[in-house]
């Protein structure tokens, strides 16, 4: 049987993550992930700057019509001495093989199953 692709997710905000100056303290921005679909999904966050950007929770499972708030934190840094072009967070998601799965498993993303991605660029307002 062919595997069905994961349905769309929604994020709020939908387009980007914004951090405002000053950058001398840790700042946190919240992103809501919504699974409007009919299947349980596993999700995982990645970033281009893992030493500066952290996500909590970094992964999880969402049932149909469920949502979760994810805290995206930016550690203190000097924007004049660091390249911030291309900074982004990416949320990846896939259908869970077991419709009753409650715990995230990294192996869902490592096989030949279908994984979808949504990039959220990071904007730094100096």
Curated annotation (Swiss-Prot):
Sperm. GO terms for cellular component: cytoplasm; cytoskeleton; pseudopodium. Residues 8-125 form the MSP domain. It is found in: Cell projection, Pseudopodium; Cytoplasm, Cytoskeleton. It comes from the Eukaryota. The modification N-acetylalanine is found at residue 2. Signal peptide: none annotated. Keywords: Acetylation, Cell projection, Cytoplasm, Cytoskeleton. Pfam families: Motile_Sperm. InterPro entries: Ig-like_fold (IPR013783), MSP_dom (IPR000535), Nematode_MSP (IPR051155), PapD-like_sf (IPR008962). Central component in molecular interactions underlying sperm crawling. Forms an extensive filament system that extends from sperm villipoda, along the leading edge of the pseudopod. This is Major sperm protein 1.
């Amino acid at each position: 049987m062919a595997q069905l692709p994961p349905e769309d997710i929604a994020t709020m905000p939908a387009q980007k993550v914004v951090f405002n100056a000053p950058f001398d303290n840790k700042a946190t921005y919240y992103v809501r992930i919504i699974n409007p679909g009919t299947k349980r999904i596993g999700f995982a966050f990645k970033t281009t700057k893992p030493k500066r950007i952290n996500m909590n929770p970094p992964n999880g499972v969402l049932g149909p019509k469920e949502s979760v708030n994810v805290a995206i934190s930016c550690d203190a840094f000097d924007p004049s001495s660091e390249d911030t072009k291309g900074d982004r967070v990416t949320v990846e998601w896939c259908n869970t093989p077991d419709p009753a799965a409650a715990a995230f498993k990294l192996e869902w993303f490592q096989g030949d199953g279908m994984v979808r991605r949504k990039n959220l660029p990071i904007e730094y307002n100096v």
